Amino acid sequence: MTKFYYLTVLLLAIISCTTTPKTSVTLHIEGSRTDYPTFLNTQDSVYSITLDSTGTAVVNLPENFQPNYGMIRFGLMRFPVYLEPNKSFELSIKIEEHNVTPNFTGEGANKNIYLNSDIFKNNAPDLKVSEDVFLKALEEQKSKLIANLETQNFEQEFVKKEKKRIHYSLYSILPMYISYHPYYAKVDNYQPSEHFYDVLEVAVQEEPELINMQEYKNALNGYIELAANKNMKQHDGLISLKKQLNFIQNNFKSPAIIDFTVDHFISAYVGRYGIVNLSEFLEIYETKVIDSQKKSSFNALCNKWAKISKGQPAIDFKYLDINGKEVCLKDLSGKYIYIDCWATWCGPCRGEIPHLQKLEHRYKNKNIHFVSISCDQNKADWEKMVKEEKLGGIQLHYGGDNTFMNFFMITGIPRFILLDQEGKIIQANATRPSNPETIKTFDNLRGI
């Protein structure tokens, strides 16, 4: 009996010594709202988090995962985190009116305190300044962040990785500058200089070991989009995609990079334009994308677009116009309907307005409605612009209701939609007013 007892104790001791300790992330929310959607994103998983009655939840991570960055999402709030095996931590979030205070504790707290420090807040350079000033500000900000990193006494492996993250987080802003500089600087016909493209080419390198880092993926996608579409004067989604795929083929060798970028750009195209031209690049997708999860998501996306293909009925909407009158889609039946989904802060949207006004004038008294739906969160900005610039057509504000946008899977603006007299879809992603094909399409509409 004694021998059996000691043998059992010894066996349990051996098992306890060889069992890998669990790594957990504990989240605690203190405040008036604990019912926001809550998630933990890791490099390969998304954990949906349900808080208990005390506002607490625990996520146990799998054994033997690789150290990497993640993100805790609570409503619209984002908290970057670094996850390491055997280094559990707790994030307590105290919410008081408009103040949010995160507090990290536990063995894995140090790096997460660093990642959520004030130095990373509001560090984007001013988008209205000139290119030279903007690029100089980027470099200065990078130097500042790296100097701060080197005072933290982290191990060199993390420091090396974090320097890459800092670099790509800043240089992923370059495409944003090109899109928003004309709006903030109030300049027309802005074109990036050759130097700007040169800086981008040097800044973004082929680094497949970083393919799970979100900042790198953002910078890589932005680089490909800008470099491939360089000097492209007329926006055309299909031509742009062909240029992007050709650029990927000619400039990258890593299967991991090719797998990610081909899936990203073809999925983005289908997400915005639908499956009309799918046959032109389906073979490329099937041969270059090897990840089964990506392929499954892509097939699901294509199936969604089949539901808003030509001839399918559009979902109704009910929005207020500039005079406060309620307008429904069914109220507009009997005429063709050309819909512009836009916002005042969107530079490309504003760029289409003069072309849209020409269409409105050309087809005045014709059998077609021109409807503009603003998705501005600040309704006053929309009202001011509509009145000051005397915008025509039927001007509507979405009022926070995304049902119509979600039905048409609108992920970017401007987005144009063409419906027939019965409210059925002709084009779920119609050509823009600036595209000469739009007039050809209108002229071929029966009974316009």
Which residue stretches match the model-derived regions?
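A non-transmembrane, solvent-exposed segment enriched in polar/low-complexity residues
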Residues: T18-Q191, D198
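Short, internal strand/loop/helix patches
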Residues: L320, E383-E422
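Bacterial Sec-dependent N-terminal signal peptides
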Residues: M1-T26, L445-I448
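Alpha-helical repeat scaffolds
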Residues: P182-E201, G237-I248, V276-E286, I315-D316
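Non-catalytic, surface beta->alpha helical segment in thiol-disulfide oxidoreductase systems
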Residues: G412-R415, Q421-I448
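Structural microenvironment flanking redox-active thiols in thiol-disulfide oxidoreductases
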Residues: G351-E389, G400-N406
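N-proximal helix/coil linker or "cap" segments that precede and/or mark the start of modular domains
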Residues: K242-L245, I258-L320, K325, K330-K335, ...
